[in-house]
Amino acid sequence: MRKTRLWGLLWMLFVSELRAATKLTEEKYELKEGQTLDVKCDYTLEKFASSQKAWQIIRDGEMPKTLACTERPSKNSHPVQVGRIILEDYHDHGLLRVRMVNLQVEDSGLYQCVIYQPPKEPHMLFDRIRLVVTKGFSGTPGSNENSTQNVYKIPPTTTKALCPLYTSPRTVTQAPPKSTADVSTPDSEINLTNVTDIIRVPVFNIVILLAGGFLSKSLVFSVLFAVTLRSFVP
């Protein structure tokens, strides 16, 4: 029983280290209302130059939602505008530029640049973007100093989403309890109620442990027997 608990503890530590190593990194942007988010996502030029790229938002307990995507095949430096989102794909530099103009508080959230390749899973580019938009100060001379609400005027080349709705073929299970609801917080709890059913210790290891214990007990018994025997010898 004690060995099972020890193996369970070691397994828990291993899983925790594995989760920490594979945790997706995030880059945080803190902006005010009316400002512009400007993100540049690098990609492998030889592999993804003409691939369709997309800008997605990730909400807790839901699959990523595509907000805008480039044409297919993606055209070099051709701006695509969907609402307040502008995408520009620079093939020469292997760079996707994403701008969200006239930011609002409700735009706060977690975003990502991806290679959009249905029915395959999207391939994520760059780090995920944690956007935090706060209220600006109105009525002051510098309130609109950094605002780019009316700066980017793109010709009406593309004003609708070009990517069809795509649902991942994976089965989406119900969102886990609150401890795993926040995307930015890694899981720290592991259910080990059925550890005995999950962890199977190799038989060879058990034999080695039992043999070692048996030999240790035999050695102690032999020493005690020798000491006792000498005490009775005149």
Curated annotation (Swiss-Prot):
Residues 26-134 form the Ig-like V-type domain. Keywords: Adaptive immunity, Cell membrane, Disulfide bond, Glycoprotein, Immunity, Immunoglobulin domain, Innate immunity, Membrane, Receptor, Secreted, Signal, Transmembrane, Transmembrane helix. One of its GO terms (biological process) is neutrophil chemotaxis. Mostly expressed by immune cells of the myeloid lineage, such as monocytes, macrophages, neutrophils and dendritic cells. Expression is associated with a mature stage of myeloid development. Highly expressed in adult liver, lung and spleen than in corresponding fetal tissue. Also expressed in the lymph node, placenta, spinal cord and heart tissues. Isoform 2 was detected in the lung, liver and mature monocytes. One of its GO terms (molecular function) is receptor decoy activity. InterPro entries: Ig-like_dom_sf, Ig-like_fold, Ig_sub, Ig_V-set. Induction: Up-regulated by bacteria, fungi and bacterial lipopolysaccharides (LPS). This is Triggering receptor expressed on myeloid cells 1.
